[in-house]
Amino acid sequence: MVDIHTDEEEKNFWKKLAKFLRRHGVHYEHKELKREYMRLCRKYSSLLQNRYPDNKIEINISDVFYELCTLKNSRVTREFSDAFGYIFRAESRAYFKVYDGVYDMLGELNRQGVKVWLLSNAQAIFTMPELEQLGLVRYFDGIAISSDAGFKKPDAEFAAYLFAKYPEADITPEKCLMVGNEYGSDGKVAENAGMNFLYAVSNLTPESERAEYQTPSQKE
């Protein structure tokens, strides 16, 4: 749906972030900032994985940013650390754009009365502002983000989270068609949760999967 590229290894990325934090009373040098960020990501991943050893887990990066900031300044609010998280994402993002035809497709589904939900492996503090900026939120009847659920595709628990989040919609697996461009996550979550699956080939699709899942007309 969205073509996005981020680079957290760009030469000045961590320097820019450290400079921003220092201006707001959170004193890191860039190397320490990167080191602590990576450490906290590992910490939260380990804690959640220990709690759910058999699941594909997804941490909430908002917790990482909050602890990262409060380690240096206990007066930092969650509002500030989330704002820093948005800056983190914006600085790391090389580009993001909607794939050709997505607006038309979603609009047509809406016009035909088809209910559309988004099941996304993502961080809410990154992705929700991007969806708003791209004008995509209005097309969906509901959105489930893995960082809010604590689980990610291909775990069936993430699909169950979506179904439970919108009980009034009476969503059940057999009523759903999962559409995605990554077989390992989208196809497998459909399989694990009992949904049908439509494979959408994109520039992210590995060549091996393109060949394996082509339709007969494409092969011809």
Task: Tell me what each language-model feature is.
Residues 1-99, 111:
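N-terminal helical cap/lid subdomain that shapes the substrate entry/recognition surface
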Residues 7, 28-31, 103, 107-110, ...:
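Asp-based, Mg2+/Mn2+-dependent phosphohydrolase catalytic module
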